[in-house]
Amino acid sequence: MSRVKRGNVARKRRNKILRIAKGYRGGNGKLFRTANQRVMKALCNAYRDRKRRKRDFRRLWIARINAAARLNGMSYSKLMGNLKKADVRINRKMLAQLAVIDPKSFKNVVTHSQK
């Protein structure tokens, strides 16, 4: 059986990891073993936080809508219930943007939902 020399394959694999780890502090960006650990952790964090970002933005939108709704004398849950009954199909992201950018329009939405 002939000997397998992994020169090119191993070097490409290591260089790929080191390229990803470029800019990390100290040995974390220079030494393969520590860079590999840092890259694996970074990719895990990135995967987890892509899922978390969706939750975080939804929480932010709800907090903004709630604050604006209370300024108009209504709670968040009542507003959302009234919007559903009035068959107003506007999502939380758009409601939050209305509340921040154009409070008059948001007030119109609130009054429309009360009818």
Swiss-Prot record:
One of its GO terms (cellular component) is ribosome. Pfam families: Ribosomal_L20. InterPro entries: Ribosomal_bL20, RIBOSOMAL_L20_CS, Ribosomal_protein_bL20_C. PANTHER family: 39S RIBOSOMAL PROTEIN L20 (PTHR10986). NCBIfam families: rplT_bact. It comes from Prochlorococcus marinus (strain MIT 9211). It comes from the Bacteria. This is Large ribosomal subunit protein bL20. One of its GO terms (molecular function) is structural constituent of ribosome. Keywords: Ribonucleoprotein, Ribosomal protein, RNA-binding, rRNA-binding. Belongs to the bacterial ribosomal protein bL20 family. Binds directly to 23S ribosomal RNA and is necessary for the in vitro assembly process of the 50S ribosomal subunit. It is not involved in the protein synthesizing functions of that subunit. CDD domains: Ribosomal_L20 (cd07026). GO terms for biological process: ribosomal large subunit assembly; translation.
